[in-house]
Amino acid sequence: MKASLLNKLDILQDRFEELTALLGDGEVISDQTKFRAYSKEYAELEPVVQGYKKLLGVQGDLEGAQALLKDSDPDMREMAVEEVREAKELLITLESDLQRMLLPKDPNDGRNVFLEIRAGTGGDEAAIFSGDLFRMYSRYAERRGWRVEILSENEGEHGGYKEVIARIEGDNVYGKLKFESGAHRVQRVPATESQGRIHTSACTVAVLPEPDEREAIEINPADLRVDTYRSSGAGGQHVNTTDSAIRITHIPTGTVVECQEERSQHKNRARAMAWLSAKLNDQQTAAAANAIASERKLLVGSGDRSERIRTYNFAQGRVTDHRVNLTLYSLDEILAGGVEAVIEPLLAEYQADQLAAIGE
């Protein structure tokens, strides 16, 4: 293991011992804010420190076994050879585990997200496919116990959505969905196609982490134009008869957000402001993320909205993710909410990329 990583582990071990003492301090125990913060840090460091102690123990065993290789007793030397082999194999595993634990954590992974799906090329068929994608993510959210709340929708003439915006709330939502941003392409025979010809359509997906209120970008009210209008409901008793829908324009950037799903104008405005904050934050971080991705030639992680990331081929029952050359012949299961089968290989590839960067 690199000396820099061993040095970092020594520092973390010292901090862990410091936290152990702090959590037994009466003043800290009486201050619940400090106690919770220290307890969280302790819980995060504990598996790392335990792994490091085990690593040091195995290193000691290896040194002892290597010393026995010079023993005059041939039986002892034979036993030492086996112990050296086992210790070296275990060290490789322990070092790999510790490197993974030391990978930088994305502070946004635990956040809720705003999911934007927009129909691109393909007209009505693209809108229908937008609906398919939204159902896929909604069913995946159900499987994980997340809550999905539509903020704004513009339905297609023949079904689906020209655009749909939703907020997804739950555990580790961004951590799971962050690599879904990009262009999703569908190849299939549209229901309106009489000749049976396969058409290609596309939709764009954007996944934006919801900023923490304490970290949200400060927005000058003078930079905003707020318009109200009547929600374009589907009809019936829930159609708004008041101007409860909200459209907010951030004048310096031209960014526009709308929220029309709540019957309360106040709630729609609060949702729209949260979404606007997420979009402005995304604009600030996108350039830096793209620069890092370009410099390190990341296979995944740039989040470029225009990048074609995945193809759904109905004739072959195939889903292909172009970033990691992953092809699965389980399209129906994936669209039914089984998108984890695509997400997990992407996360594994990203982790492998981070590990490679540590070794550079």
UniProtKB/Swiss-Prot annotation:
- Description of post-translational modifications: Methylated by PrmC. Methylation increases the termination efficiency of RF1.
Is Transferase one of the keywords UniProt gives this record?
A: no
Top-level taxon of the source organism: Bacteria
Q: Which SUPFAM superfamilies match?
A: Release factor
Cell compartments where the protein resides? Cytoplasm
In which broad location class does this protein mainly occur, judging by the first location in its UniProt entry?
cytoplasm
GO terms assigned for molecular function? translation release factor activity, codon specific
N5-methylglutamine: residues bearing it: 237
Task: Please indicate if the UniProt record lists Cytoplasm as a keyword.
Answer: yes
Q: Which InterPro entries match?
A: PCRF (IPR005139), Pep_chain_release_fac_I (IPR000352), Pep_chain_release_fac_I_sf (IPR045853), Prokaryotic/Mito_RF (IPR050057), RF-1 (IPR004373)
Q: Name one GO cellular component term.
A: cytoplasm
Q: Which UniProt keywords apply?
A: Cytoplasm, Methylation, Protein biosynthesis
Family to which the UniProt record says this protein belongs: Belongs to the prokaryotic/mitochondrial release factor family.
Q: Mind telling me which HAMAP family this protein's record contains?
A: Rel_fac_1
**Task of the protein:** Peptide chain release factor 1 directs the termination of translation in response to the peptide chain termination codons UAG and UAA.
Q: What is this protein called?
A: Peptide chain release factor 1
The scientific name of the source species is Pseudomonas fluorescens (strain Pf0-1)
